[in-house]
Amino acid sequence: MFAVIKTGGKQYRVAANDTLLIERIAGEVGEIVQIGNVLAVGEGENVTIGAPFVEGASVAAEVVEQGRGPKVIAFKKRRRQNSRRKRGHRQLLTTVRIAEILLDGAKPSKKVAAKPATSEEKAAEEKPAKAKKEAAEKGASPRETKAAPLFSAPEGEPDNLTVIKGIGPVAAGQLKEQGLTTFAQLAALSDEDIARIDEAMPFSTDQIKDWREQAKEVAK
């Protein structure tokens, strides 16, 4: 038996024991999630097409891994305005293993972790509520749960990082939030530091290394 499901704005043809990499859905590793958007089910020549979904059909899947995809660089350039901008993006992804295809409103043989998960949007909706709940339990506001910066900003006046080609006001503000405020700090970045920045911020490794070399020249 096979099914055609829709999740994360994409369609997949699945069968039992198939492993898929899909856009993020809520669930811990090892839990069973139920995907309710089934466009079609079939076995052999007998195929049922939904309108748009097959009534009572769903797919139970086990969460194998939660992670992120490779970084994709978006480069924008405006001609005659000397404007260039690079942004990095890593898509949140979930690896699932199809456990079973269910018909006529049947329930999964294993306990489902939560309500039927259809896309990454549900996970995004749960994150703010979870942060507020944890903050309330600790007697703190949601803003106080913000992660610590990657680096410790030195005392004194910060440098104007926008002097470095490729660092605009927005990028300079993002670097400042992570404790990077001077040319000396950028010039002293190690490859390990650059890897940490690449993981946590929307900048590529090559981009940060270029800033490091420019900062060395400016800091002389």
Swiss-Prot record:
InterPro entries: bL21-like (IPR028909), bL21-like_sf (IPR036164), DUF4332 (IPR025567), Ribosomal_bL21 (IPR001787)
Assigned keywords, A-Z: Ribonucleoprotein, Ribosomal protein, RNA-binding, rRNA-binding
Annotated stretches, region: Disordered: 109-158
Gene3D superfamilies from the UniProt entry: 5' to 3' exonuclease, C-terminal subdomain (1.10.150.20)
One example of a Gene Ontology biological process annotation: translation
Biased composition (Basic and acidic residues): 118-146
GO cellular component, one term: ribosome
Coiled-coil parts of chain: none
Superkingdom: Bacteria
One function term, GO molecular function aspect: rRNA binding
Functional note: This protein binds to 23S rRNA in the presence of protein L20.
HAMAP family referenced in this protein's UniProt entry, alphabetically: Ribosomal_bL21
Family membership noted in the UniProt record: Belongs to the bacterial ribosomal protein bL21 family.
Subunit structure: Part of the 50S ribosomal subunit. Contacts protein L20.
Name listed for the protein in its UniProt record: Large ribosomal subunit protein bL21
Source species of the chain: Chelativorans sp. (strain BNC1)
